[in-house]
């Protein structure tokens, strides 16, 4: 149950969850955002705070459907960072994420990674971020312990969403037969 998430995060000695990637075909992101349509987003779940969703400027209306605190990537222009890094894409993106994390007060502790991103570039970004923010330790949840435990029970709103999706699925199957 999402309302138990803060307790589950704390019990697992984690300071934040970082869910990254598109909202579609990304079970961890969909669990938190619902069926919104964003092509790329970064969601940070920090105990004691409203979740924070970073999103593309053109996707702000979809992002707003989550009810989370929203920050557009446009607040962190890559063109300026690329100038500072002499065109180094990795360094510029790492600086961008460093500023994003600093702005949400996430500069130390353990951050559990979830989501669906291209592995190589994301791994390189995480390594670079660990150098820029030595107080943060990023780690993967190999068994999906935290999110699976949260998903194990449902509150009324989550049950209603499941029922709604079941009705949609049933209606589509009837039309196809």
Question: Model-found features: residue ranges?
Answer:
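Flexible, acidic/His-enriched mid-domain "rim/lid" segments that flank
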Residues: 91-177
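N-terminal accessory/capping or targeting/presequence segment of soluble
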Residues: 1-99, 167
């Amino acid at each position: 149950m999402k309302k138990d998430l803060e307790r589950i995060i704390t019990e697992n000695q984690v300071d934040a969850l970082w869910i990254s990637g598109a909202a579609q075909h990304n079970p961890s992101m969909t669990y938190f955002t619902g069926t919104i349509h964003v092509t790329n987003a970064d969601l940070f779940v920090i105990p004691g705070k409203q979740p924070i969703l970073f999103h593309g400027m053109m996707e702000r209306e979809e992002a707003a459907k989550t009810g989370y605190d929203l920050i557009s990537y446009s607040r962190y222009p890559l063109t300026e960072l690329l100038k500072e890094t002499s065109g180094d894409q990795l360094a510029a993106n790492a600086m961008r994420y460093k500023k994003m994390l600093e702005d949400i007060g996430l500069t130390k502790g353990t951050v559990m990674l979830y989501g669906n991103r291209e592995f190589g570039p994301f791994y390189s970004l995480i390594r670079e971020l660990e150098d820029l923010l030595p107080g943060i330790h990023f780690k993967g949840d190999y068994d999906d312990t935290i999110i699976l435990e949260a998903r194990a029970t449902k509150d009324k709103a989550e049950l209603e969403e499941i029922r709604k999706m079941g009705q949609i699925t049933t209606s589509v199957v009837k039309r196809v037969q």
